[in-house]
Amino acid sequence: MSDYTNTVTVEITSDDSLVADVIVVPVASGAVPRLPEDSKFRAYEDILQKLGVTGSKDELTRIPLDGSKHVVLAFIGVGKAFSATELMFAAGSAVRQIGARCIQIDFSVTQKDKLSAIVEGAFLGAYRFDKYRSKKSECPEVIRVSHNINGITDSECRQIIARAKVIAGSVGLAKDLVNTTGDDLYPAQFASFVAKDLEGIDHISVESWDEKRLQEKSCGGILGVGRGSNFPPRLVKISYTPGQYKKHLSLVGKGITFDTGGLSLKPASAMLGMKYDMTGAANVFAVLRIVALLRLSVRVTGWLCLAENMLSGSAIRPGDILRTYSGKTVEVTNTDAEGRLVLADGLALAGDERPDVIIDIATLTGAAKVALGESCSGLMGNNPDLLCSLEVAAKSVGEKFLAVPIDDDALQKALKSDIADIVNVPTSNKVPGMQFGAVFLKEFETTNDSGEAIPWAHLDVAGPANASYDTGFNSCGPTGVAVRSLVEFCRCLSSAPERKLF
């Protein structure tokens, strides 16, 4: 695995000359297709209308450029408005769909935030995963992004490109991890990759706990889930500690490198995509990488809870009792609810450091996908202000988080076990699965030195973690969901640490 952004060159230019193979122009939807007011290609609006172009997202229409035998105009739909997020998705969609060697994105932008969004979208759209293909996918080699911004300096343009490259490259590495098959990526190999990739980055350190260390620390959740596999579990701690900071954020990621369901075996159709069950850990790694490379002034600690959930003579059985790191015992009523068991250890370990806020991310429940679909992540926690701040951060980068309440007495009662502290799955089928998963994890929240619960949020990304169709800058497969949202949240903590976010 390597940073794919090193294989594509993105340039920012104010040069009006059309020197690319394909010129990409945005078109918005409405009663008639609309181009930006100052676009040099507005004369094509009538042609687009006659062709039935709607301007809907991902719609791509190719027309030969007047007076040129070799240059093609590609009109990409942006939806209803030329907003920064819509332009980002449109740029990414065009780059994803067009295989020409040189592309010029001419969106007639006059604002720096829109230019930044377009460059980021272009980088994200250039991602390809060809590890297991005999023939490589076509991908642009040069992407020129033109603009109409007065007074922007070359230095500012370089900064925009550098930032977008860091974000897209890190998201790409997370996607590579998720795309890699279970037989090529077991817990120890995952841990080794993270340590090697982050080596040499300023202010960042990586610590990997093997099964012996996990045993010494009494991490019964991670050990229990991993004991049925020939490949033992790992816990990876990534620490980013800049020279100056005022806030400390802990991120905990579920990292089940393959999930058979254990003895509560999944059906074959449900097992096929279970290499994706380590999305949370992969995306936490990406957030730490971005935050460190962008040198944000916020301390961030990542906890990657890595295990393979297999079935064997040594696998945990329904009815077994696991003692987690916190000392709390769990009756395993279903071995296919293993993600919450590894997160239980990760959350308690994160709490030991008394950070200002803890956020976990996991493909935790199928119920989240049923309830919210593929475009929205479930957001739950113990602090309404934190949930609101995360929703705002997500919206600003074009993602969707929906806060879901979990303060329900019935959910609390469903945790009850006859022989242990709690169960991992309720015996009643009337309990909402997504919310119960969060209520289970809430049992492992920690108090700060003042005796108050540390603000905690749980992101269930089971729906948007994996796209079932191509859209925007994402091809079918892993999406890197929540990475950019959490980076934006970190940026807020870094730039305005006194601002009330939780």
Curated annotation (Swiss-Prot):
A GO term (biological process) for this protein? proteolysis
Annotated HAMAP family: Cytosol_peptidase_M17 (MF_00181)
State the function annotated in the UniProt record. Answer: Presumably involved in the processing and regular turnover of intracellular proteins. Catalyzes the removal of unsubstituted N-terminal amino acids from various peptides.
What positions does the entry give for Mn(2+) 2 binding? K254, D259, D277, E338
The places in or outside the cell where this protein is found are: Cytoplasm
Protein name (database record): Probable cytosol aminopeptidase
What is the enzyme's main class? hydrolase
Q: What is the lineage of its organism?
A: Bacteria, Bacillati, Actinomycetota, Actinomycetes, Micrococcales
